[in-house]
């Protein structure tokens, strides 16, 4: 199947909306004012095999973030049109007890993988990769801790505990919490090596995921490769393998637009299940079987 897509979007800044620590002891009036960011992404797709086409508002995201104290930040984000559905995405408070250390509680994206952690305004392609869309795409409610080391050998370490019941079943009680750990190693300003692992238990089957990714970036090029391995407890489903690799070259423009990008990608995924069970057969359901 060949899918052609064009996309137009209005976007926020690269680091837009995340809760940040203020480098001051006392807040002024302007420091209490919230930041408002948004991403509106519309696209047109044409499917050559069936000669069918469609227009779609893929995202209409808006976020509000700010500080109530130099070391206490907040963020709330909603998508008014995620393929036609309204979804509450982020709703959290973040505390910075000391410099470079933070704790976050609330609803957020789980720290896992490279591509699944990108917001729509950071995506390189009109359609997300299989890792970002299916295999590694998790938002949940929980508590995370993050530490950034800027000296010596720089790195960012994140980890957290989560309900595991998604965004809509927050009142459920759990005997086992999900966890996720992510480490970013930054040998220099151009390289990023990311290693992460996650355990989830959506119903009765424990699922473990392991991800490794690396990218190189300079003023013109972004080259990235990522591999995700997913295994199911008691061999309830075949192990899943997913790969996302791409290259992006930016050509600067002087008028109207800032740049034009040339991209190529290899994206694959074996049969995948999110852990939901068929009520009749009691077997795990294959997601997006007709992909």
Regions flagged by a language model, labelled:
Residues 24-164, 175, 183-192, 246, ...:
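Outer membrane beta-barrel
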Residues 1-20:
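Cleavable N-terminal export/targeting peptides
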Residues 15-22, 102, 208:
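An N-terminal domain-start capping segment
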Residues 178:
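Conserved adenosyl
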Residues 169-173:
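Active-site cleft segment of glycoside hydrolase catalytic domains centered on the general acid/base Glu
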